[in-house]
């Protein structure tokens, strides 16, 4: 879950899985985190809802280990 200051700068990020507060310095997330901002569509029971949540890297790893089919992972060729 993310909180922003009135000026739009990122203030804090808390893992929705375990409650860990992730490191944010000067509006920049300084550790591994996974953000979801998903707008549910017409064919869903959640149509019209947008879900926002964050996971720390450990909770992300725990989540994907539950998958029957692993996610596709590729190497990034450029880092921003």
Residue ranges and their predicted role:
Residues 1-80:
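Acidic/histidine-enriched, beta-strand-rich ligand/metal-binding domains
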């Amino acid at each position: 879950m993310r909180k922003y200051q009135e000026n739009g700068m990122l203030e804090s990020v808390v893992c929705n899985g375990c409650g860990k507060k992730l490191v944010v310095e000067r509006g920049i997330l300084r550790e591994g985190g996974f953000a979801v901002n998903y707008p549910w569509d017409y064919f869903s029971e959640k149509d019209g809802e947008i879900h926002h949540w964050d996971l720390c890297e450990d909770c992300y790893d725990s989540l994907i280990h539950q998958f029957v089919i692993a996610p596709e992972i590729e190497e990034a060729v450029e880092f921003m």
